[in-house]
Each structure stands twice: as structure tokens, then as C-alpha cells.
């Protein structure tokens, strides 16, 4: 919640990226070669914010550093806001960001699958919304879920590791998706942001947009694709159970294969 207070101030600065990474995301990469030592010292509940800014000259760049630090002065941090112009150091920081999903998914419990989704919220509610989403994840026994996102856009990704080899695992996942939908919509958020609506989220489009708009979507689909040849069932799908059908299970094989995503 505290980290999300930075979204509105950062939008007033010359910032090209502000990447949010939760503690589970950082934990997934903290033991990789070249990772900053500070990652291993972070407490549970901590998050990191990777800010990228650039300029054509050193004077302008230093001014931008100062402006960003000033805008974030009201945000409580575990470590002081700091910047670097060392190419090797900032490349290390970006390796943290780029490697977190694959590292987290490869380290998931054996026999589970990795399911990734992305949601979005307005900047003024992002902190409260993500806190609630994290509570939903915990209630549905996904405490190891990994969360990261593009803070400036209010867009957050998360990946969970359900065991769909068991019927109760599928039932638990279905219950989670419904409560996730309810939580996102309660905060006036979007069930999709950066990526398209696939079969996993299709059953919840009607709830998100309401009957009238959903009916209009279906009319447009029928008009432009009367034979339903283009991505059938991906966005418009009247089967409320489609997201838990034809799931690709992950039987145990060997230690190497079980890490595949």
C-alpha cells in the first residue's frame, strides 16, 4: 500500500518506467548470481520499485533524480531513494525484473502449474486494491503467488501455482477466480489490461461489463464474424465453466522436466 502512494507523484516526473516487485518476486531471484545483497535482507511484505529515467545530458539527468526523490519524500521506504548511472549496476537491477517470472515459475511446487493474469486499477485506489488482492490470494492458499507490475499504468501481473491434478485443486482455483473478479470490480478495476482476454477470464466479462454492453459485444462479434471463426470462445463465451475445462495437467516426471513452465 505504501509503495503505491508513489504512482501519482511519479506521473508528474520524467519517468519512463516504474516497476513494482513484491517480496515473493524478489525472493525468487535473490539467490541468482549478481543479485544485490540487500534483496535477502528484506522483510516479508516489502516491495521494490525500479524507476527508470533518462536525459540527453548529465545536468538534466541530475535534476530529474532530484525531482523524483523530492516527489517521493512522503513515501516511507526501508532504504533511501537512490539512483545510479553505472551501466553494470542498472543492468543488474533490470535483470532482477526480467528474471523474476521464470525464476518463480521454475521454483514452484512440483506437480503444480503456473497461471498468470494481469489486472489494473486507477492510481488513487491501487494500494488498497492490491492489498485486498493479496488477501484473496492468501485466503485461497496461494501465499507463494508472485506479483509485479507497471506502476505508472496501475497494471499488475501475478502468477499462482495451483495443483490442477486434483479435483479439489481445480475447485479451489475456480473459487479464487470468482473472488478475484469480485474484488477487482469492487475497486472499479479492469480484469484485463496489458494482455488480451483469454478463455481463463472470458466467463467473467459479462459480470465486468454488465448485460447490456455484453449483449452489444456479442452483436458486434456476430456481425463481424458470423461463422465464429476468429478466436472462438476467447473473449465472448457463454460457458461459465470454460476456464476450468481442458486444463493441461502437470504429472510428475523428473526434477528437470517438473521445472518447465
State where each predicted segment sits.
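Noncatalytic alpha-helical scaffold of FAD-dependent oxidoreductases
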Residues: 1-193, 197-261
